[in-house]
């Protein structure tokens, strides 16, 4: 997960089995290599506290599995970046985000709150380009290159069936963490929330944009 607060950093969740000795040795070996290559200049190891109040307690194993699979999905998206134009990359991210959240959409009353939360920054011309791109090109086939996309969607269906917190809260938290993995930039996240809402409103108003 990428963050900018304090200073730019990456947070890695590490799961240890048994006494975890071998796994810890691998972690420290990785850290030493990263320090030597100057990929990082510092590190800290902290206890991981599950956020039950945010995601609910009953399905947390599924939530953590989603974290792992969504991380793979974000890496796959970022690998495609160099072969896409800016509009194609933004359109792909909007398509994937809506696809992931489809199971929630019929259950959330206030979509405007979820997707336009805390932001008034909408570039209408960019939003129109994204809508046109999604309407005229087959992003379903492009998403077949993203091996973790379907697995994420299937996991979300199970998570929803076992949820213990409101739909809006769960959708908002999962969307936020998805964009943290992609960008780690709140301003950029809020711009994407606007794009998502623009596409959803367009489909409500009869513009055909297929999201699968």
What would you call each of these model-derived segments?
Residues 1-212:
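An acidic, charge-biased composition feature
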């Amino acid at each position: 997960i990428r963050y900018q607060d304090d200073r730019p950093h990456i947070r890695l969740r590490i799961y240890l089995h048994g006494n975890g000795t071998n796994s810890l040795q691998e972690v420290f070996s990785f850290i030493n290599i990263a320090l030597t290559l100057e990929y990082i200049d510092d590190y800290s190891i902290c206890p991981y506290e599950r956020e039950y109040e945010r995601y609910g307690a009953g399905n947390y194993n599924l939530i953590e599995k989603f974290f792992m699979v969504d991380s793979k999905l974000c890496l796959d998206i970022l690998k495609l970046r160099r072969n896409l134009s800016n509009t194609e990359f933004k359109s792909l991210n909007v398509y994937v985000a809506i696809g992931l959240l489809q199971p929630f959409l019929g259950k959330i009353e206030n979509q405007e709150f979820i997707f336009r939360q805390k932001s008034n920054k909408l570039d209408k011309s960019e939003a129109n380009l994204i809508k046109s791109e999604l309407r005229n090109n087959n992003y379903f086939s492009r998403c077949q290159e993203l091996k973790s996309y379907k697995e994420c969607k299937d996991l979300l269906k199970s998570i929803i069936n076992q949820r213990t917190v409101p739909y809006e809260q769960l959708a908002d938290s999962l969307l936020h963490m998805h964009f943290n993995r992609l960008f780690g930039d709140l301003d950029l996240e809020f711009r994407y929330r606007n794009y998502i809402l623009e596409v959803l409103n367009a489909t409500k108003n009869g513009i055909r944009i297929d999201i699968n």
